[in-house]
Amino acid sequence: MAAAKRIADEPAFVLHSYDWSESSLILEVFCRHQGRVALVAKGAKKPSSNFRPVLLPLQPLWLSYALAADGNADIHTLKGAEWVGGHVMPTGDALLSGLYLNELLLRLLARSDPHAALFDAYTGVVRVLASEHGDALEPVLRSFELLLLRAIGLLPSLAAQTMTLAPLQADTRYTLVPEGGLRAAAAAERAALPGHQWQVLQHALDDAASHQATVRACAPVCAELKPQLRTLLQYHCGSPMLRTRQLMIDLQAL
């Protein structure tokens, strides 16, 4: 019998884990070269398992795994996991924000669809979440939301009105909506940006260093951008509401 094909030393993050048996876990991981992958971590729940202290969310890992013998199977077998190190686990709002991004990736990324640039952006966001992030948190979150939507083909061009392809006027306010894309905002719509700011965002997304450029472009417009992206993302994620979003609402109500 031919040996199972193996993926070795793959940069990855754990997005989510759940019980598979009394001693094992199913992992949903985001890999740089393989995309979103499901793995069974046999024995990972045992106190003696080398996997147990390593398979945590928001921690950079090197993973090795054997592909399922059935080439069409979705779940592969974890063979090795090594913590890369470099930062501590985020806490507080930063931890919730990281889990929110993980949930977006779980809902929106198809299995085995690689997005290396998006993985690199995610790595940068996690680094910020684990640091004394201060005012940097909101811009990196908004930037990643834009990059994610663009990577999976759900973000229209921000340089023109979506339905008419008419160019944006610098001082006219426009809003981003789920079914109509970018359109002129009504007077009562508060979540909108002037045309020149949408164009700045588009230029940033087109930049070779799109993550850093988009973070800078998002910084002055986070308050206006946040509700528009939240609505767009929830629309594409479908029902029910994102669990992390509901948790944030519940905590704010306390």
Swiss-Prot record:
It comes from the Bacteria. Keywords: DNA damage, DNA recombination, DNA repair. The keyword DNA damage applies. Pfam families: RecO_C, RecO_N. GO terms for biological process: DNA recombination; double-strand break repair. GO terms for cellular component: bacterial nucleoid. Belongs to the RecO family. This is DNA repair protein RecO. It comes from Verminephrobacter eiseniae (strain EF01-2). The gene is recO.
